[in-house]
């Protein structure tokens, strides 16, 4: 296992989604930041995808290098319009291998994969089809990095 910590961050400034996201990213900083999971209400699937796209593009433009993974949970945060849970790596001897939608941490024989929120390519398909696609994506990531599906310990 690797030493990690989580922090909850609440947007305190901004009127637009981009401004609130920037405020959270400034508060989060960049040192050791592996993943940021945003919380914001969404009225429907279309709004969910729009918000996710905005959050991803804002994070990509904010972090030129070592971009953290991005997840979005469609849930109204208490006391704010946008909140986030930031995951930091405090383990200075870990090797970090960043990929487009996941990060691989290694140190000797120890390996850990951290993923973004994995979203199906089409959220209008049935829940069965969505879950099949998502688990296939997860399986591909695990296989590519020498893991077994039974190695998953937190979803």
Describe each PLM feature range.
Residues 1-155:
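Short, polar/acidic, helix-capping and beta-turn segments at strand->helix junctions
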